[in-house]
A protein has these predicted regions:
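N-terminal Rossmann-like FAD-binding beta1-loop-alpha1 element of flavoenzymes
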Residues: 4-31
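Short loop/edge segments at beta-strand edges and connector loops
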Residues: 10, 85, 237-239
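Conserved Rossmann-like nucleotide-cofactor binding loop
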Residues: 14, 37, 273
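Glycine-rich FAD pyrophosphate-binding loop
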Residues: 23-48
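Conserved FAD-binding subdomain of flavin-dependent enzymes
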Residues: 37, 45, 49-83, 143
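Mobile amphipathic helical/loop "lid" adjacent to a hydrophobic cofactor/ligand pocket
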Residues: 68-69, 73-74, 78-189
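Mid-domain catalytic core of redox enzymes
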Residues: 87, 240-370
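Helical element adjacent to the flavin cofactor pocket in flavoenzyme catalytic cores
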Residues: 194-257, 261, 265, 269
Length: 370
């Protein structure tokens, strides 16, 4: 065992953050990533016929993502994100040519969007008046009360708090789908309440939208790699962890294809099915008769992890000669559209176009399994 050595498995944002935190705490850290690049799902792929880097999906962030923005600051990558000066969330019903936006006004939270909400054409006055009860309940909720709702469906909580079906469909459901990547019929009330309490109805600038000014592989990966190296973190790319070794309830080593790394702690920052696979292959050793008990605990953990489900997120990229949407169009939520939930003009976000005369329009499809 290498005392004090932390091995982080997985080079996505969670793994990178964990590695930096451990290094800052004075620990020796090794980060292992199976692919050739860091960033996990926050990455890009090459267009099959053009020399363009395309993000695997349309990504955005919000000012309330303070830990993510802190990570970008740590990596000196702030310039890769363009944040709105004031919250502006456009909604559209194209077939009826109705467009409107929720914007920040002069009132203090949670009422800072009340002015634009009063003129919001997609909800009736009855819908809007009913929303006051839910907003009041969210504002008075503390964290303990929030997490006690984990086994409650958010749609049931909304109905219990007087929300109309139209408000659920045209307001609450969109934010749940976009932020949690799950339908409102399945979403935990605890998770959704946290989203609205800390986000939309939190600080006045919490939902200022942030867009990436270049492809993710260019804007994030080099900066994060540099930050890790400067912190003294050893990075191992293109290497898959096969198993971990546990002795007397302590992680002592990690097995790669051609080498074994000694350690005293392991952090899993991997998709849950990969975590389960590594643990299933783990080796347990003990000088006291708890080997069977330890193995049983790992088996149960793998079974529990295996119950966790995924929800897919698909990115649709369209390229046009000339403009299909106005040049000053940024993005909009598509009301009453189950598939085309949002439309983004990627040109409005980029620091320079991918090609002169080409307009890039993207559509993220959340909870695409459905």
């Amino acid at each position: 065992m290498d005392e004090g050595h932390v091995i982080v498995i997985g080079g996505g944002l969670a793994g990178i953050s964990a590695a930096l935190a451990c290094s800052d705490a004075g620990r020796k850290v090794t980060l292992i990533e199976a692919r050739s690049h860091l960033g996990g799902r926050v990455s890009s792929v090459k267009h099959p016929r053009q020399d363009w880097q395309l993000d695997n999906c349309q990504h955005a962030c919000f000012r309330v993502y303070d830990r993510f923005l802190q990570l970008m600051g740590r990596a000196n990558a702030q310039q890769s994100i363009k944040l709105q000066a004031n919250t502006h969330l456009p909604f559209a019903l194209p077939e009826k040519k109705v467009f409107s936006a929720l914007t920040t006004g002069r009132l203090s939270p949670p009422n800072h969007m009340m002015g634009s909400m009063l003129s919001f054409p997609f909800l009736s006055m009855r819908d809007k008046l009913a929303m006051r009860k839910a907003v009041k309940a969210l504002s008075s909720m503390d964290n303990q009360q929030m997490w006690q709702l984990d086994d409650t469906l958010f749609i049931d909580w909304l109905r219990q708090n007087g929300q109309t079906e139209r408000a659920i469909d045209r307001f609450w459901a969109f934010f749940v789908l976009a932020a949690l990547n799950i339908s409102i019929q399945e979403a935990s009330a605890a998770q959704a309440c946290m989203l609205f309490k800390n986000g939309l109805f939190g600080a006045a600038d919490a939902f200022d939208v942030g867009a990436f000014t270049s492809d993710l592989s260019d804007s994030i990966e080099p900066a994060l790699s540099s930050a890790l190296e400067q912190a003294g973190v050893k990075i191992i790319r293109n290497s898959t962890v096969k198993a971990v070794v546990i002795e007397n309830n302590v992680f002592t080593s990690v097995k790669l294809k051609d080498e074994i790394l000694q350690c005293s702690d392991v952090i899993f920052a991997t998709p849950h099915h990969i975590t389960a696979r590594i643990l299933e292959n783990s080796v347990t050793k003990s000088e006291i008769p708890v080997l069977e008990e330890m193995g049983s605990k790992i088996d149960k953990l793998c079974t529990d992890i295996g119950r966790i489900e995924y929800r897919s997120l698909i990115g649709i990229h369209s390229f046009y000669r000339g403009n299909r949407v106005p040049k000053d169009f940024t993005f909009a939520v598509m009301v009453d559209q189950p598939l085309i939930q949002m439309v983004f003009n990627r040109n409005s976000e980029l620091s320079s176009p991918i090609e002169e005369g080409v307009q890039w329009v993207t559509v993220p499809v959340s909870a695409a399994d459905e």
